[in-house]
């Protein structure tokens, strides 16, 4: 059986098990993301947890972080690679807490649809604000990322009113292999 097809079957079954209608996802044009193989450590995040990224992304993250630091801006990792199972458990916890499927999928991607699976997505913060809040857009770190992130291949995926129906996430950046 084709690996890609098997993964898609796993995604559909998991969505069904979680009570997430596939139409809610496909209507938002969310692509399926397979897991990164062999993500590498980028050290610990701001909470002391080991974080991982895809190899080239990790290299560009370190380079970007060093350049920001040289400009007096501190970029901190909050969350990098997340496995399919991690994302499933995240959704299960939110369902158990009483959140509706609609509420959850505007904030958290269902398993199989998270950019974090690729090892190329990174939630970024700075000591200037609490992590994963819209307040991040008011920081020097966000301003620096808006001006310089593309120099290292990073782009914010979920701007205001994005096509995927995801809340505005100024902290969520994805590496696209478009730098020399």
Which residues make up each language-model segment?
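Extracytoplasmic cell-surface/polysaccharide-interacting catalytic and binding patches
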Residues: 1-80, 84-180
